Structures are given as C-alpha cells and as structure tokens.
Amino acid sequence: MSKVRPLINSLPVIHERAAGIDIGSRFHVVAVPSTLSDEPVQTFQAFTADIQRMADWLKTIGVETVVMESTGVYWVPVFEVLESAGIGVMVANARETRSVPGRKSDINDAQWLQRLHACGLLRASFRPGRDIAALRAYLRHRERLLDYAAAHIQHMQKALTFMNLQLHHVVQDITGVTGMKIIRAIVAGERDPQVLAEFRDVRCKSSIEIIHGALVGNYQSEHVFVLTQSLALYDFYQARVDECDVQIEQALAVLTADKPEPEQPIPKARHRTKQPNAVNFDVRTALYQLIGVDLTQIHGIGPFLALRLVAECGTDLSKWRTAKQFTSWLTLSPGCKISGGKVLSAHSRKSSNRLTAHLRLAAVTVGRTNTALGAFYRRLAARIGKAKAVTATARKIAVLFYNAMRFGMHYSDPGAEQYEQKYRERVIKQLHRRAAEFGFILQEAECVS
C-alpha cells in the first residue's frame, strides 16, 4: 500500500481573477484559473484581430487583472489592447519571474506567471501614462537619429583625413559654422585652400593662415564621393531631428494644456549658451509651466536633460514612495547581498536604464564645477575613486530631482566653500566625540609665530 503524502498548504490567493500571458513573436499563450473556464490555457495568434479576441474572452470570463513579461517589444500591442478593454495589465520584470529549472514550455510559463500573480508575488514595472509615453517615444527616436547623424560625421571626418585635409585640427567641431561652410564648398567643387580658408567664422580661434595650411590636400574622386554622400545623409538626419522637435513641442503642449500659469516667474537661467543638439524651442519655459519648478537650477541638469528626465519618469513621482525607492529603481543605491549575517557584496546592480546613464554623465560634468555637488564629488573621488564618486553624485542629483518633482522643492546651491566648512565642522565634532569615549579632551592648537 503506497503512502499518502500530506498536502502542503498553498500560498494564499490575493487576485482570484488573475491571468498570465506568455508573450511571443508569433503567438501568445494565456492561462487563467481553472474555476473561470473549462479550457484554462488558450493560444492566440499575434495578429490584432486575435489579440482583440483574447481581450473579449478575458472580459467574458471575468478576468480583472493580467500579468505578462516584458519580452522585447512584443508585449506593447497586447498591453495597449487589454488596457483599452478595461482590464488591469501588469508588466513584470523577467528577472523576478524565473521558474524553477526543469520542464519549460510556453504553457508552463503562462501558468507560472498566473500563479505568481494570483498570490501577489509580482511587482509591476513602471510604465508612464499615454501622453508621457508618447513624449518618451519621440525623445528616444530623436536620440537614435542623433546617433545615426554622428556616424556620418565620423564618415565625413574619415574622408577628409584620407585627403589629408586636417580640418578637425583647426576647428573645434567640423559640424560648426566654419567646418560646415568649408565642407559644403569642397562638395560643391572648390579646391583652392585660400578660398576655403575665407569661410572662417570670426569666432574661430584659428587664423586664416593656419586654416589655409590645413586645407592643402590630396583630392581623390572616391573620397570626395564618400564625403558628398556622408554630408547628404547627415543633412537628412538633421532634417528628421527638426521634424522630431516639432512633435516633441506638440506633445508638451498637450501635457500643459490644462496646467495653470505658474504664480512665480521663471528664475533666471544659469547658462545662456545653447547646448549642442538642443531642441529648437524653449524647453525650459514649457517644463516650468508643466511642473511648476525650474529643474535647471539643479547643477548638472540642463534643459534637455530635464526634458529627458520628465519623459522617462513622468510628472507624478508618487509611484515611488520615497527617494530611496526612486534611487533603487535607478540602480544608484547599494545592492547589499547578505548571507549568514555577512555582507557579501554592496555593488549597485547593473542596469540599462536610460535615466541612470544620463545622471552619471551629469555627475561627471558637475564634478568639474565650483559647487557643493562638485566639492562632494571631488572629496569622494579622492577617497574611494572616481567610479564610486560618480555613482554617489548621480544619486544625489536623482534625490534632488525627486524632491523637486514630488514636493516642489526649489534648489539653491550653497557653494563649495560652505560645503567644505560644514564638512570640516562635522569631522571635528566626530573627533571630539571619539576623544570623549576614550577619556580625552581635544583642544585647538595655538598658532606659533
């Protein structure tokens, strides 16, 4: 007679009408509780009509919430159709939905997702609202266009180097006013270095004589052809970027349509120079009307970076209850791994989050400024190294951004000197406390002349 194994108490069910979807490129597998349908696992093709039929079936059997993995971009149409049908949709991080090793199939994955979601063991990944998602899509596409344009800048520079035209040595940027005038003249057929040097802009630091010497080249038809096509492709992508700027401006106008005018006028800009690859409209004013706070007053955050931050996070940061949760989502906080009471590792997690990369770049920039954040970066860089200092400074900038967006905090830089003074006072206070613990009293040394 075989032994009857005792039943193990299962986890409590929190979402009784939950479904799980295993997303694929050709078809999607949907699993629902067996109490809702005689066929709890069904497969639907990836066509729009089939996805709509999936939504109708889920609505018919009374499913209230659905979970799916963020598999590539295949989940996006499913998410949008189900959301428009009035079903709560959750996108889970694949790192948190790993199944035990063994038999793996699409059906098992869908049932595993449904079980985890029913027991409330999954967390929803952040996804902004429809209007913010549109703004984010435009900005990400714009960055991709700029990457394509940058590749053709390299092609132009390589073609110039083949012809021994040392333009990049006499101008700071070959896509500047002087550089583009000279390149367009070469493409148009001009070969006289004296005539080309006359295109020098008055703001160019190199003299006409130096530019003349750099433009004596060895012209070859194949390299001129490459230069011509690279210039045409660069102009093409720049035109697409301008079209993208129009869409971004319209998306911001939709977001600010129902926003009242700020009570206080916008603060004076810290920098008046236009940044490279900046958008072709007043981003700072539009963002100030949208959120009521001038993010550019935070050192390290310029108008375009502020726009990127808002596009990636949205305007409502209450989804992160504290600044610690926000920095953890950005993977800028320590990732402690503890076993047996011992800290095995405290390295921050690796992430492909775009915001994290932008904030790290901002931290490197602010480290060269005479500000409190710059002094903080330099103090840490000398003690623990530049890599960790970049992460810590990026986290500080992220906390300032969170407080400005969540609580309307207006940032005012105390300056590097005040920061160093407060740091000195804090260290002295710690020394006095440590000395008192050992029964000593610290006294300030008198200056001996």
Features from the language model and the residues they span:
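A detector of single, family-specific signature residues
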Residues: M1-S449
